[in-house]
Structure formats: C-alpha cells, structure tokens
C-alpha cells in the first residue's frame, strides 16, 4: 500500500504535469521537502520533476546532436562504447557476471548492434591498462564542462584537451565539478512491456514506487526515440532498475552519470560555439563522454 507521503508526492506531481500540459510555467522541480517543518508531518522523499520537453523539442538538444553521415555516426558511437568497455574492464575485470558496469555496457552494445568481434576485441585489448581522466572545463557563456577520458598517455591527452578547449572558446579550469552530482541513471522506453504508452504522469508515479529522485524526458540520439531517464542515488542504481523492470517498464540501460544541478542559458552565438566545442571534444579518440550544464 502506498504511504501517505508517497500519495502526496503523486498528487502534487500529477498537478504539475497537468499544469504543464495547459501551458503554465513550472519550475525546475515541483515537489520538495521542507527542511524545518513545524507541522509534525511525516517526512517524505524529494521527487524532482524536470520541466523540459522531449529532447527533440529543446533548442540545445536540437543543435548539440547534429549528426554526420549515418556510417560515421555509428562508427563514433562504437568508438565511445569501446572506450566504455575498456574502462569497465579496467575497474572491475572482464567477466560481466562479476562486473555489473561491464554487463550494462555490453547490453547497450548489443542494443546498438555493435559487431561481436568489436566487443570481443575491446574486452581483450591490452589498452585496458589506460588511465581514467576527468577534466574540468569552462565553455561559452560561463557553462561548465566535465570531460571523461581513458588514455594511455595522460600528459598528451591533457595537452590535446586543453588545446581543443582554448581553440573553441573554452578553457581548463577548476571548480566545474561542483556544478554536477554523480547519480545513477536508468533509461527506459516510453512503452511498457505490454506495448502501452507511458506518459510523464505515470512515469512519476513509478519513480516514487521505485525510489527514484527525478524523472527526465530524453531522446535516443541515433534512433530518435523518446525515452525516460529515472535518476537516483548512485548507491541504489541497480535496485531502482530492478524495481522499474518489475513494474512493467522496459529498461534500456543503467549507468552512473554526472548530472548538473544548476544550468545556464546561452545566447544563439554562444550555443553555436558550444556545439562546435563539444563536438570537437567528443571527436577526440580518448574522450568517453562530455557533460555540460547548458539549459
């Protein structure tokens, strides 16, 4: 049976969802917990509701995912997945039965139809001895960037990332990490196992039941499919995914990601410059992922 607190969250989240459908502006979260309540009410978990449209309808999402020829795009995705496999093997070994991070990545690889030979090559690669690097950067308009990389030469990678940043209106800086939280992210489709559509209101109810903190609408860059991202505490990632699966949702992947807790808005020229910068960083052979806090 749903608790009073959970029911209260569900009702409030639903009101926020209906308000957005009617065109009202909703803040970055709809439900919050008062830290110093004097009414003696039972404490309840905070559930944030991201007030954003699906990625395909968001200005930043439209410009940041400009894709080249399909073959080149698939090659880029496979290259980044190879880096992710190498990092997972480096941190937890080559056996997916004992390495949940690797198991999750291999699941994504199969969903992207990555060739088996490419996966096996990445698993056995001697380059798995590379160094994990996390660079902090400043982008156009005061935006913050985190650049994850895996390299066999830390100094060389550092110089090249610094050069790309400087060339495209950015710079290396300290402090960008403070704008992000490392969270668990479970990605699910917008249809359940019975092929019934799941709307945001229903996703919010399931998030409460599964123990997630946030629900965000997203889009698969390659297949242009709408998705939901359930965000949770890093330590509860696998429990949340298991619960969402048990509730009938179709999970696509789960991973740990850097999620911005404050965002910045950029002008049109700044957005264009940010696109070029992030694309240049993403094209570096050692870069796994580039995180930003652009609205």
Curated annotation (Swiss-Prot):
What PANTHER family does its record include?
Answer: TRANSLATIONAL ACTIVATOR OF CYTOCHROME C OXIDASE 1
Which of the residues bear the PTM N6-acetyllysine?
Answer: 162
Q: Which UniProt keywords apply?
A: Acetylation, Activator, Coiled coil, Mitochondrion, Translation regulation
Q: InterPro entries of this UniProt entry?
A: Integrase-like_N, TACO1_YebC-like_2nd/3rd_dom, TACO1_YebC_N, Transcrip_reg_TACO1-like, Transcrip_reg_TACO1-like_dom3, YebC-like
Name the GO cellular-component terms.
Answer: mitochondrion
**SUPFAM superfamilies, per database record:** YebC-like
Primary localization class, coarse: mitochondrion
Relate the protein's function as given in its record.
Acts as a translational activator of mitochondrially-encoded cytochrome c oxidase 1.
Q: Does the keyword Iron apply?
A: no
Task: Name its cellular compartments.
Answer: Mitochondrion
The family classification in the record reads: Belongs to the TACO1 family.
What is the name attached to this protein's record? Translational activator of cytochrome c oxidase 1
Q: What GO molecular function terms would the record report?
A: mitochondrial ribosome binding; mRNA binding; rRNA binding
List the GO biological process terms. Answer: mitochondrial cytochrome c oxidase assembly; motor learning; regulation of mitochondrial translation
Per the UniProt record, the source organism is Rattus norvegicus
Coiled coil location: 190-225
